[in-house]
């Protein structure tokens, strides 16, 4: 197993992983064409988001992670956010999530990022436990939204 930066040929896998992540995390069904459009934009412009894939011995993606950056004027640097992360069920519970996180953390440190953050659906207990096992902790902040 190894982690590498995603390439355009990985797009079908990334679309599938993202759709499955949304279904598992929120019970929501996403439109594949919309996912493809959004992921493709980021694959072509890494300033929007960066994707990595975990591949098996045949170089077939079995999981992915994407990260975005948020500027902090208070700290004059970028916070890195896990935007999405997914592992195929057959690869869960084997320490493979840490391979994906290590790739993100490595690049974040190279670019002098401030810290790695993520948000997780409050009812997704499996993901919360996995992130806690990866040493993420709860923040003092809550996410709030203003809908159109």
Predicted regions and their residues:
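Hydrophobic adenine-recognition pocket in adenosine-nucleotide-binding enzymes
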Residues: 6, 85-87, 120
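Conserved active-site alpha-helix within GNAT-family acetyltransferase domains
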Residues: 98, 122-140, 146
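Acetyl-CoA-dependent GNAT
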Residues: 5-9, 16-77, 83, 101-103, ...
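Short alpha-helical
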Residues: 9, 13, 125-126
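Extreme N-terminal starter segment of soluble prokaryotic enzymes
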Residues: 1-2
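A short, internal acetyl-CoA/4′-phosphopantetheine-binding micro-motif in the GNAT/acyltransferase core
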Residues: 82-92
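Conserved GNAT acetyl-CoA-binding A-motif
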Residues: 109-119
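Conserved acetyl-CoA pyrophosphate-binding loop and the N-cap/start of the following alpha-helix
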Residues: 91, 95-103
